[in-house]
Amino acid sequence: MTSPRKTHPLMKIINSSFIDLPTPSNISSWWNFGSLLGACLMIQITTGLFLAMHYTPDTSTAFSSVAHITRDINYGWMIRLLHANGASMFFVCLFLHTGRGLYYGSFLFLNTWNIGTILLLMTMATAFMGYVLPWGQMSFWGATVITNLLSAIPYTGHNLVQWIWGGFSVDKPTLTRFFTFHFILPFIITALATIHLLFLHETGSNNPSGMASSPDKIMFHPYYTTKDIFGLTLLLLLLTSLTLFTPDLLTDPDNYTLANPLNTPPHIKPEWYFLFAYTILRSIPNKLGGVLALLLSIMILTIIPATHLSKQQSMMFRPITQILFWTLAADLLTLTWIGGQPVEYPFEAIGQTASIAYFLIITLIPLSALTENKLLKW
């Protein structure tokens, strides 16, 4: 008799996606980050739901409601810190997952890659709106500065900013709508992640060599479920250690001060995972130019497949491109560091150099591919 796992309409979908799924036998730990992102999303939705039960999206009570969660709710402090640090873990996994896709040429699966880019943008939007909700100093001023960038759009910019604010400044209507979107977007992200998986299973997973893996595939369960559980254990260990030992390591002290529109913090900056883009934004003296560079720093991912000129899919056997890739990784770390520094010498000059290097390296990668093709006489 055939197992219900293979015949039941619902079980059949789960079976073909997570149990009997044919998977390349040589995929490394870099392929673990997909499942870790799923786990991060579940952690964020679960902790977020419990926080939403006690949070009030009103400028007069938002800050005190977060203090109430931390002090008076059973394990409220832990739920809040898991949610805040869980976002950091989410972005660590996101950046590593995207980096793996770039290194091993997974961007050639166009549908999967494009949905992934949309997922990255939506996650960034969700995190930004979540950062505004505690209504601390950095929440208020971060929201004011970032939303005000839209005023750089010709003709409609000023009206667009006021439409987003719901008035003439960041106030109660802004907070209410940010809470609404912050609540609904994770569920849209979950739906998009399902589509992302659907497209991935249409083509099958890539592998480190970049070669066809059809002749050598194994079942996903038990081999890769065990591997994923091990990865998840390490992630949870890191998240709980961060939450319980150094909970404020990645947060801004200014956010423990109630939002005050009359007092500007000495240095307005977003959360650490946006700092690379923030550095690129402020490296350009022109407002519109900075906004365009900021957008391009993320949207450049969509044109990466069109610039792939190598005869090999993966970078595994391409030493020149490998040097460029790891230089790009170091450049992104430099941009992140500079974003947390004040706009003064030497940080300003380093930021401008690193911003130019970011776009230059991405431009040089297709040229290095052509050079490697010539060296290999392809």
Swiss-Prot record:
Chain residues that bind a ubiquinone: H201
Residue spans crossing the bilayer: 33-53, 77-98, 113-133, 178-198, 226-246, 288-308, 320-340, 347-366
Organism: Cebus albifrons
Note: Heme 1 (or BL or b562) is low-potential and absorbs at about 562 nm, and heme 2 (or BH or b566) is high-potential and absorbs at about 566 nm.
InterPro entries: Cyt_b/b6_C (IPR005798), Cyt_b/b6_C_sf (IPR036150), Cyt_b/b6_N (IPR005797), Cytb/b6-like_sf (IPR027387), Cytochrome_b (IPR030689), Cytochrome_b_C_euk/bac (IPR048260), Cytochrome_b_N_euk/bac (IPR048259), Di-haem_cyt_TM (IPR016174)
Domain of life: Eukaryota
Cellular location(s): Mitochondrion inner membrane
Keyword annotations: Electron transport, Heme, Iron, Membrane, Metal-binding, Mitochondrion, Mitochondrion inner membrane, Respiratory chain, Transmembrane, Transmembrane helix, Transport, Ubiquinone
Protein's UniProt keywords contain Transport: yes
UniProt-listed GO biological process terms: mitochondrial electron transport, ubiquinol to cytochrome c
Name assigned to this protein: Cytochrome b
